């Protein structure tokens, strides 16, 4: 453990001080809401109800003036705690904007130490800047190349910390500004009170997303800490440089971690790590779900499982049972990952071999990584969004009844095209055609409800080609790009898979089943 602690001290030498005064600078809040920051790895779209851009700038200046008062935050908390329910509601409506923009500005500030670590790296210019690394679909070509040669897989759900206070010591390694950490504890305390209040009052549930960007940053920091030790142990377990093809949004921080890894040459430490030495161990993650696959024996996977459980217990101080991390052989197991049901299939082939006058057949087996659309969970997501019933029967969307016909068709078409674009890597398209059918008929019934007619009468009057023009736009483009190898008819089946390298986030309907 002493060698490991020495490693962390060297790797975390770049720590920043005095971040708290940045909250009094207007440019921080400009960065938080600037359109140019939408490419940030922590960006989340934000809406303010009842405020335009000009009034927002005025309120930001007023907020900075109030923050110069020493007890501004203390008075806000006491005001909301003493007045009970009425105090809570008044607090949410009067201080919602102030609290929200402070948390957004604070999120930008605490990201600064992580960004400076990447900029200060001497090898930063050597890091490839390919935009394809941002695509979520770039994980699947990696799985296609690797999983067909592996034997065991473990489907892992990274547990959430029992208390958010556990996340503060993680940031203490990177940030030594004590006032900033106290402000972080203030937001965590406020969030805890907000959760207990919202459970009994659904009318103001929208405010539960007030600090979404901040808590995504904290969660990414927590998961990054898990991967920090995982990468460290992986680098110690082999003498050759490992090739990392994993893609995730916080890739810049991942590169920073990779470049700051220091080899600890100690005989006793190497003896401790010998059970984890496996050159065929692969790890991918998206959000809180990870996959650990290995070519080694089942015993090696069990050692990794108990290591992770003990690591979570002693380092993050919460309990996790080993039996919740299942280890399965790849040939008999299917797992959900990023909206796909993935598995490794065995394809037998008979090859005819002829030598001189003798000929004989050779039976050959090929392993193939296969991905299909999980139709039942996806229909469940459509049912929650009120596009169909639980059994998949299309229904109208009365909430959109006040929109124009073009807007209704455009919204349904956009959802359908996004799903088609995301699930273009499926080997079986029949499930995707069923989803398209549900959305088409739901769109027709929404238009019929608006015009007080029936879906059949509406389609007979306008023609079915009106809807097909919107829903088949992407298929026509792809058939133009791949005219010979990959036909894209409206109905039919083809097994060609296309992974799109421009998808940086999961569709909302797909995100519910991940």
UniProtKB/Swiss-Prot annotation:
Keyword terms, alphabetized: Chloroplast, mRNA processing, Plastid, RNA-binding, tRNA processing
A matching Pfam family: Intron_maturas2
GO biological process, one term: RNA splicing
Subcellular location(s) per record: Plastid, Chloroplast
Family matches, as InterPro entries: Domain_X, Maturase_MatK, Maturase_MatK_N
Main location group: plastid
Gene Ontology molecular-function annotations: RNA binding
A cellular-component GO term for this protein: chloroplast
Function (record text): Usually encoded in the trnK tRNA gene intron. Probably assists in splicing its own and other chloroplast group II introns.
Family the entry assigns: Belongs to the intron maturase 2 family. MatK subfamily.
Protein name: Maturase K
Classification lineage: Eukaryota, Viridiplantae, Streptophyta, Embryophyta, Tracheophyta
Gene: matK
